[in-house]
Amino acid sequence: MYPLARRILFALDAEKAHHFTLDALNMVYKLGLIPVTGNRTKPVKLMGLDLPNPVGLAAGLDKNGEYIDALGALGFGFIEIGTVTPNPQPGNPQPRLFRVPEYQGIINRMGFNNHGIDAMIQNIEKSKFSGVLGINIGKNAVTPIENAADDYLICLEKAYAHASYITVNISSPNTKNLRALQGGDELSALLEALKNKQAQLASVHGKYVPLAVKIAPDLDEAQIEDIAHVVKSVEMDGIIATNTTIDKSSLGSHPLAGEQGGLSGLPVHEKSNRVLKLLADHIDGKLPIIGVGGIMEGRDAAEKIRLGATAVQVYSGLIYKGPALVKECLKALARSAQNAV
């Protein structure tokens, strides 16, 4: 059924199709036509959290937490919403989202378009979702990069009571200079400030909410080693590898290869896995990794687990394969676990 729906959706503008799909999913959910499945097929512990299974939804699909309940009915082990910023912002001018079906890729330069952290919290409070919910936080475009920590601290404080875990997004290529925060000194200063605030908030709220950081696939081994050193030294709870790539050489002479933005889907698969493997080697089991990037079928999820991830997230694969991808990943992980025995 989804291949037919995809043909119709792919005839629409990519961003319009995105909103139409989520609105339709929400309507079907509210009509009770989506059977809520727990999918406790492969429970796993992640950052101290009990996941019913290790296949999660990556940030970016539901930026404002408007579709949490409907997405929660699709069998994910956890859901991540955002990226959210302190204040609402429109993001970059349209068009800013492009499909590259010949390569099973997506290019986006959305620019953290969202309604702001306060609106997101209102949506979370209206939700009935009781599963593991991650909130992905970023900085406003107008905030100077030297003041970025202020924005992350605002979001952390406001999101803390409503999140199962919080992800610090420093790897989007669509906010000017954001990726500079991945550098050693800048990264250390930012994460130390956030860990200090986390400790204060844990005392105030009487609960510990884990902090993860999301990194880019466009890193060399020295940069990956530096990041691994920092996240271990500040005692981050987890790391997400990876975001989208700015390298579009895999698209060859495709007309969209010159578009600005981050490329996701199948073209980022190898880059993401390379970073994941190197990161796992340098982290040496000190904190868990969530693998994301280029999971287009079940065996891709199993490969990320073999490379060192504790859990995985999907996004672009959902656009191309539909919700059935979740079950396909879970089946592949189960087969992989059996073969390893």
Curated annotation (Swiss-Prot):
What does the cofactor field's note say? Answer: Binds 1 FMN per subunit.
Q: Please tell me whether the keyword Methyltransferase is annotated for this protein.
A: no
**Which Gene3D superfamilies did the record assign?**
Aldolase class I
Q: Which InterPro entries match?
A: Aldolase_TIM, DHO_dehydrogenase, Dihydroorotate_DH_1_2, Dihydroorotate_DH_2, Dihydroorotate_DH_cat, Dihydroorotate_DH_CS
- Main location group: membrane
* Residues noted as binding FMN in the record, renumbered to the chain: 59-63, 83, 136, 169, 214, 242, 265, 294, 315-316
Protein keywords:
Cell membrane, Flavoprotein, FMN, Membrane, Oxidoreductase, Pyrimidine biosynthesis
A GO molecular-function annotation: dihydroorotate dehydrogenase (quinone) activity
State its cofactor: FMN
The UniProt entry lists membrane topology as:
Peripheral membrane protein
Q: Top EC class per UniProt?
A: oxidoreductase
Query: Its pathway?
Result: Pyrimidine metabolism; UMP biosynthesis via de novo pathway; orotate from (S)-dihydroorotate (quinone route): step 1/1
Binding-site residues for substrate, renumbered to this chain: 63, 108-112, 169, 174, 243-244
Q: Which domain of life is it from?
A: Bacteria
State the GO CC annotations.
Answer: cytoplasm; plasma membrane
Q: Which GO terms describe its biological process?
A: 'de novo' pyrimidine nucleobase biosynthetic process; 'de novo' UMP biosynthetic process
Localization, UniProt:
Cell membrane
PROSITE patterns named among the record's database cross-references: DHODEHASE_1
Q: What is its EC number?
A: 1.3.5.2
Is Lipid metabolism given among the entry's keywords?
A: no
> Which residues of this protein are catalytic?
172
Role: Catalyzes the conversion of dihydroorotate to orotate with quinone as electron acceptor.
Q: Which family does it belong to?
A: Belongs to the dihydroorotate dehydrogenase family. Type 2 subfamily.
Cross-referenced PANTHER family: DIHYDROOROTATE DEHYDROGENASE (QUINONE), MITOCHONDRIAL (PTHR48109:SF4), DIHYDROOROTATE DEHYDROGENASE (QUINONE), MITOCHONDRIAL-RELATED (PTHR48109)
Quaternary structure and partners: Monomer.
Q: What is this protein called?
A: Dihydroorotate dehydrogenase (quinone)
Lineage here is:
Bacteria, Pseudomonadati, Pseudomonadota, Betaproteobacteria, Neisseriales
